[in-house]
Amino acid sequence: MKTIEVDDELYSYIASHTKHIGESASDILRRMLKFSAASQPAAPVTKEVRVASPAIVEAKPVKTIKDKVRAMRELLLSDEYAEQKRAVNRFMLLLSTLYSLDAQAFAEATESLHGRTRVYFAADEQTLLKNGNQTKPKHVSGTPYWVITNTNTGRKCSMIEHIMLSMQFPAELIEKVCGTI
């Protein structure tokens, strides 16, 4: 077994082709390259991988639900997420990531998300402040959205749950994400 270094983008692409838990990188690459261990010696594999790599990087235009799930799992395992000491910071990072995965679905989810007397998301800070001076609005990084942040962790979880359900994430992932806030 040899070790090779790949950049993050290529790693993510290869990981996005995982078919089952525990599948090795070698198995994934063999399947992607339609290569079997018995058919050719090791040297041509290296050549084949190098030729195929540029095509792999370019062939990543649309995010499927599997890609979105993988991206959320990668976020939960990331150092950036682990370094967040406060629930509000994890909440903000989750919102930013969800938006980056599918801006349209995120927009649709947030439009239907509001409390009895409160608006949770808006395009500007003033709209949120109109619904209460103590809402502590914060801008969601990388998005046109502002969100109120003076809610308890349970409310933050239910907001994330609503958005993820609307974006058609699997229930077990939603539960896992909410458990980390």
Swiss-Prot record:
InterPro entries: Arc_rbn_hlx_hlx, Ribbon_hlx_hlx, SeqA, SeqA_DNA-bd_C, SeqA_DNA-bd_C_sf, SeqA_N. Keywords: Cytoplasm, DNA replication inhibitor, DNA-binding. One of its GO terms (cellular component) is cytoplasm. Residues 87-88, 116-120, 150-156 are annotated as: Interaction with DNA. The keyword DNA-binding applies. Gene3D superfamilies: Met repressor-like, Replication modulator SeqA, C-terminal DNA-binding domain. GO terms for molecular function: sequence-specific DNA binding. It is found in: Cytoplasm. GO terms for biological process: negative regulation of DNA-templated DNA replication initiation; regulation of DNA-templated transcription. Its main location: cytoplasm. Homodimer. Polymerizes to form helical filaments. Belongs to the SeqA family. Negative regulator of replication initiation, which contributes to regulation of DNA replication and ensures that replication initiation occurs exactly once per chromosome per cell cycle. Binds to pairs of hemimethylated GATC sequences in the oriC region, thus preventing assembly of replication proteins and re-initiation at newly replicated origins. Repression is relieved when the region becomes fully methylated. This is Negative modulator of initiation of replication. It comes from Shigella dysenteriae serotype 1 (strain Sd197).
